[in-house]
């Protein structure tokens, strides 16, 4: 998993809203099929996965609506910025994901996109259930209380 302190991973894009908007039940590291200009654009850090989601269609896993900026030096050989990108996952994992999202209210949300220690682009997706407004308020209240506790412990 890509963490901010781990030197072997370089985080490209992070979906910060995912943990606020969804209950994440489980997560999975998957590969992603990219073109050369997309990889070069990712190396410059020009991407956004905040509005994207993953979907299982025709026995394949797809990343939909992820933004990877056009690479300027690619010229006419560039790529479409919001094209559908195939995600690489084993059949066993795909069956597990298909079963998980078959339940009511479940979806696949991209959490983090990063380069692993071998320089390959990986995507961490989570099986998630949407939060209601009251749940979001509760999460915010817990976070505020934890910050307040830390301040109090630091002071005294």
Curated annotation (Swiss-Prot):
Statement: the UniProt record of this protein carries the keyword RNA-binding: yes
Q: Would you identify the family this protein belongs to, as annotated?
A: Belongs to the SmpB family.
Q: Which UniProt keywords apply?
A: Cytoplasm, RNA-binding
What is a single molecular function from GO for this protein?
A: RNA binding
- List GO BP terms, alphabetically: trans-translation
The cellular location(s) given in this protein's UniProt record come to: Cytoplasm
State its role.
Answer: Required for rescue of stalled ribosomes mediated by trans-translation. Binds to transfer-messenger RNA (tmRNA), required for stable association of tmRNA with ribosomes. tmRNA and SmpB together mimic tRNA shape, replacing the anticodon stem-loop with SmpB. tmRNA is encoded by the ssrA gene; the 2 termini fold to resemble tRNA(Ala) and it encodes a 'tag peptide', a short internal open reading frame. During trans-translation Ala-aminoacylated tmRNA acts like a tRNA, entering the A-site of stalled ribosomes, displacing the stalled mRNA.
Among InterPro entries, the record links this protein to: SmpB, SsrA-bd_prot
Determine the domain of life of the protein's source: Bacteria
* Keyword RNA-binding in annotation: yes
* Signal sequence, start to end: none
The record's annotation in Pfam families points to:
SmpB
Q: Which organism is it from?
A: Paracoccus denitrificans (strain Pd 1222)
Alphabetical GO CC annotations of the entry are: cytosol
Name of the protein this chain belongs to: SsrA-binding protein
């Amino acid at each position: 998993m890509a963490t901010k302190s781990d030197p072997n991973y370089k985080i490209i894009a992070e979906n910060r809203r995912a943990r606020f908007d969804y209950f994440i039940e489980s997560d999975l590291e998957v590969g992603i099929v990219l073109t050369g200009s997309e990889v070069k654009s990712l190396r410059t850090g020009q991407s956004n996965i905040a509005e994207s989601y993953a979907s299982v269609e025709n026995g394949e896993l797809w990343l939909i609506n992820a933004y990877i900026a056009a690479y300027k030096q690619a010229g006419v050989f560039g790529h479409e910025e919001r094209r559908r990108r195939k995600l690489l996952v084993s059949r066993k994992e795909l069956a597990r994901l298909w079963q998980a999202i078959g339940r009511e209210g479940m979806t696949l949300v991209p959490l983090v996109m990063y380069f692993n220690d071998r320089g390959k682009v990986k995507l961490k997706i989570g099986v998630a259930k949407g939060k209601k407004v009251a749940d979001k308020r509760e999460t915010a209240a817990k976070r505020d209380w934890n910050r307040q506790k830390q301040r109090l412990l630091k002071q005294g």
